[in-house]
Amino acid sequence: MSSQCPFSHLAATNLTMGNGAPVADNQNSLTAGPRGPLLAQDLWLNEKLADFVREVIPERRMHAKGSGAFGTFTVTHDITKYTRAKIFSEVGKKTEMFARFTTVAGERGAADAERDIRGFALKFYTEEGNWDLVGNNTPVFFLRDPRKFPDLNKAVKRDPRTNMRSATNNWDFWTLLPEALHQVTVVMSDRGIPASYRHMHGFGSHTYSFWNEAGERFWVKFHFRTQQGIKNLTDAEAAEIIANDRESHQRDLYEAIERGDFPKWTLFVQIMPEADAEKVPYHPFDLTKVWSKKDYPLIEVGEFELNRNPENFFADVEQSAFAPSNLVPGIGASPDRMLQARLFNYADAQRYRLGVNYRQIPVNRPRCPVHSNQRDGQGRVDGNYGSLPHYEPNSFSQWQQQPDFAEPPLRINGDAAHWDYRNDDNDYFSQPRALFNLMNAEQKQSLFNNTAAAMGDAPDFIKYRHIRNCHWCDAAYGEGVAKALGLTVEDALKARDTDPALGQGGLL
């Protein structure tokens, strides 16, 4: 490592206050005599203290701990028959981008190497506006209805009494949502602790839509395959790393980019014709399900490379704001309930965290012209469009709507009601069963051991509940988890009749 000062190239400058006035003394406070009290007229002390207590902004409710980098996306294959989005308009086209990778459940001070999902958020600065793809390193999630998302957050965060993470709360919640078993199986598998952000895949997870110049709609899933190869950590390896370095993932990403070892991912899509959504044997908009790659194979699109670290972490990573509602012509949403809720909730979270004008922060600012009647608000710094009219319609030919970019109509029918997913699709186990059966014996044993370790001191009735769910998924799955927990499947099946949650819909 070089011993040279990293700022040796900068010319000496003078320290000023926030208003530009010179700071005469930055070492000693203004006092009445050498041993007297402070004076209220010490303007620089007042400013430093006032700014200091306001430096921390609200942390993200989820995905609080993260790392980021800038890069470039390059199109390598033609998909214009599926989408009119200009980011994909020609082979060889390059688009600047920013990526943020995260843990999910932990706070800003959490260790990078914890067993957890990893966030995989990408912002593409396209000529038609910013496109945000806000995904994870897993293709599925615990939930399929957003009503339970705040509850998930509370279950995996700190207990309101002890202020500690609670295996009881966590597993009580998961085991009463049988649809969560698919994601639980992923998180408790070897892939539950990636060795680094560079060595994991990414997924859009949700079903999105494409539409082309002819107005044809296709449903789409996004997959990002790491070109560095998959590498994971065992619980023991992760514990050793955490004991010495809580920023292991951030350090790995930053140092790789600094030495010119730029990480890359290949983008693939799965494409489903619009009409197929009513024909497939599974719910194509269910976030707890994946699509068959046999029926809808991966189609290569391009690759992205991360090649520039932020100059200031707070400015670019902490203030980066991602929202699935940041879409561009040719890329749209779907009836996925979880996605529908995120279309509002994510942008609203950024308004709370960063203010209504968060899009003016450089890392979030579109690279294309922005002509909007949205005005004023705290932190407006772009001139606020001066004296231009801020209403529409107006008589001055200003900023007309663009009907050529309208999304094709989507046929929707049905009565408005609180429709229960379980009445529509109660196949909780076929896909986690398929995943389990893809594992070799060693991987299955890791799954059993990791599950037992994660369940920790949760009460037996919760452990029995999870054993039952695993048993109904696959007998060998249930048997393996039971043995790792020092319990039996037989006792778990008997324990159902005395489960405290008896009568709840999620108790199977």
Curated annotation (Swiss-Prot):
It comes from the Bacteria. One of its GO terms (molecular function) is metal ion binding. InterPro entries: Catalase (IPR018028), Catalase_3 (IPR040333), Catalase_AS (IPR024708), Catalase_clade1/3 (IPR024711), Catalase_core (IPR011614), Catalase_haem_BS (IPR002226), Catalase_immune_responsive (IPR010582), Catalase_sf (IPR020835). One of its GO terms (cellular component) is cytoplasm. It is an enzyme of class 1 (oxidoreductase). One of its GO terms (biological process) is response to hydrogen peroxide. Its EC number is 1.11.1.6. The keyword Cytoplasm applies. Induction: By hydrogen peroxide. Keywords: Cytoplasm, Heme, Hydrogen peroxide, Iron, Metal-binding, Oxidoreductase, Peroxidase. It catalyses: 2 H2O2 = O2 + 2 H2O. Its main location: cytoplasm. Homohexamer. This is Catalase. It comes from Haemophilus influenzae (strain ATCC 51907 / DSM 11121 / KW20 / Rd). The gene is katA.
